[in-house]
Amino acid sequence: MENTRRSFLKKVSAAGIGAAGLAMAGNAGATTTAAEPQKKKTAGKDDGKLRFGFIGTGSRCHEHINNVLAIPGNKIVAICDIQQGPIDSTLKHIAKFNVPAPKVYKGGEREFENMLNNEEFDCVIIASPWEWHVPMSVAAMKAGVPYVGVEVSAANTLEECWDLVNVSEATGSHLNIMENVCYRRDCMAALNMVRQGLFGEILHGGCGYEHDLREVKFNDGTHYNYVPGSGDLRMGPTAFAEAQWRTNHSVHRNGDIYPTHGIGPIAHCMDINRGNRFLSLSAMATQSRGLHKFIVDNGGENHPLAKVNFNLGDIVTSMIKCSNGQTIIVTHDTNSPRPYSLGFRVQGTEGLWMNDGDHVYVQGKSKPHRWDDSDEWFKKYDHKLWASLESQAAEAGHGGMDYIMMYDLIDAIRNKKPAPMDCYDAAAWSAISGLSEMSIARGGALVDFPDFTRGQWIHRQPQFAL
């Protein structure tokens, strides 16, 4: 098992090194035809319960399990991981619900393929390290799983983005990107205000991922976060959880490597892939200082990791132009000391919402040149999903948005509806990573967004959270 884990982590590291090199248009010219999943599966086979599988059994998997089992009519058929520790933790977690234990697939790094080929699922959730999101999603769709939920970001390169689109179209399987921030209560209220015209014609959006992850990117191999004062800083195979693989991206890549928390809600406000699309992007990055400084400050100048050259700029800024004229600024900032923010801004001809400061201004309704507290507006324009599910979501992760997201996906599965956030959303949002890397490598040059819908965006209608 240990050899398998080390082999896996070595491949993760190699994938990180090659990520920027793979950021190319890939299959942009490929065409596919829609088809039904090659394995016909009935939602709620036999006992009427939806059959779920999980690939990757870390902490994010536990959050999803909580919500799958909190919503009536679901069961967990199988789980898969290459490490025994997370498997044991997940089995213990599931046992708290007094439900049958799932079948366990473990051992080799391709064991997930055996799980997909041996079991029948209504949905498989993928919560693995980033490098495995696309291979596992593709395998699940090709195995005929009707709905595949992939954690964020869905893909690391443009080639991978095209893989998700092409395979979803070819197999008929519904790929859903599990972007929980799209279900954040304030984001859904703001979307409601946009759709009701409170902000007028939308002109501009701002968003990002501004989250101090220094204590996540390094730890002592036992604790999820770095233990202050310990001086025990590790990354890679000897570290624990995300520090085993995530920090490697900061070594070998320079771009917005985690864009979807921010861009997802803004994309919905601008009807991206549904009457509008991203046209082009330009990105720039600051110098890389934060991670090295964190190592020296906590481990000393002679710490082995002080010799690591981190490529990721501390702050990466991308500007996107949309076909309907809007602009969007996306910021990635995970290596700096700072409070958490996703920096949302939705601005139109009649007003705007600013997440930082909790501000709303609506022309003709707000006092001139004075901000309103966003709470008073968001209570009035609370989205119906939140209004109806508030009590159920109250105890769920991330303030309840995880529950709302899973509820919406399960509703789609039961009613055989399209995925709430489909393969085109997954590709367009995730493509910011590869495109920003390309742009930065070219000195901030403007790069074109692929049209992952191949022209369908012109006629597609909004479907999210209607």
UniProtKB/Swiss-Prot annotation:
InterPro entries reported for this sequence: Gfo/Idh/MocA-like_OxRdtase_N, Gfo/Idh/MocA_oxidrdct_glycsds, Glyco_hydro_109_C, NAD(P)-bd_dom_sf, TAT_signal, TAT_signal_bac_arc
Binding site for NAD(+): 59-60, 81, 130-133, 151-152, 180, 241-245, 258
Binding residues for substrate: 209, 246, 258-261, 340
Cited function: Glycosidase.
Family the entry assigns: Belongs to the Gfo/Idh/MocA family. Glycosyl hydrolase 109 subfamily.
NCBIfam families in UniProt: TAT_signal_seq
Protein's name in the database: Glycosyl hydrolase family 109 protein
